[in-house]
Structure formats: C-alpha cells, structure tokens
Amino acid sequence: MRSVLLVEDDIFDTMTAEKSFAKFNIPHQLHTAFNGEEALDLLLGRNGAEALRPLPEVILLDLNMPRMNGLEFLTELRASADFADIPVFITTTSDMDVDRLATETLGVSGYSLKPLAFEPGDLSDSRRLLEKLLR
C-alpha cells in the first residue's frame, strides 16, 4: 500500500482525488494537510503533530493555499535532505507558464490541472505519471 500526502485546501478536490484512487483500485493510505505549513508539521512532527512515518512515497501538492503556498512548501521540502527525494506531483488550477517553470526548477515529478479526476480510458500524461508514482 502506497503512502500519499495530499496537500490541498479545498475539500471538494480532496474528495475528488480520493475517488480517483478508488476508481482505479490504487492501494494507498491518504494523509491530508490543508496547507504547506500543516504538511511540514506532519513531516517534521512539530506543533503537536505526530511525525508521518514511514514518509509518504508521493506528495500531491496544490499551489494556491493560505498560510504557506505550494511553492513555499516545495522550497522548504527540497532544502531538507530527509525529504528532497520524495516525488511531488503538482495539482493546481493555474496553467500559467511561470508556475510551471518555478515548480520545474524545484524538481517536481509532474504537473496536472485540477481536478485530479481521471475517467476510464483517459490516456493523459498526468494519469500515466500518477499511476507510475503510485504503483
């Protein structure tokens, strides 16, 4: 079973991602954080959160969130040797080239527009990459 950390402030998008995993029978244990700060708390075991162990095998990350956005979180994540190798898959409503370039320089594994919902027969690059990361 794969451990997945979903960093997403929208409950609808969280539920949609969960349904997509179930639809494709992707065995997973989903952990959620509602912003980058909460995600770091989970990874580091700070501010009363128990450290998430084992570490997630993949992080699904929204870019636009309150308190600490996805780029700020990704910058801190990549600065830590303990977390630098965790694959990060961006899920966002932003299709701006500047966001894509910023995330590429921080070593993301993939970028997909929301919602993270795949239909049977979907052959998109995002679906193939996500399946590769989660299997």
Label each residue range with its predicted role.
Residues 2-22, 59:
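Conserved acidic segment of CheY-like receiver
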Residues 26, 54-57, 82-87:
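His-Asp phosphorelay/catalytic-motif detector in bacterial-type signaling
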Residues 32-58, 121-122:
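Acidic, metal-coordinating helix/loop segments flanking the phosphotransfer/catalytic sites
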Residues 62, 92:
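Active-site residues of response regulator receiver
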Residues 65:
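Receiver (REC) domain active-site loop signature in two-component systems and cognate sites
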Residues 94-98:
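Negatively charged, flexible loop motifs adjacent to catalytic sites
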Residues 109:
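Short, glycine/charged-rich "phosphate-handling" switch motifs in NTP-dependent
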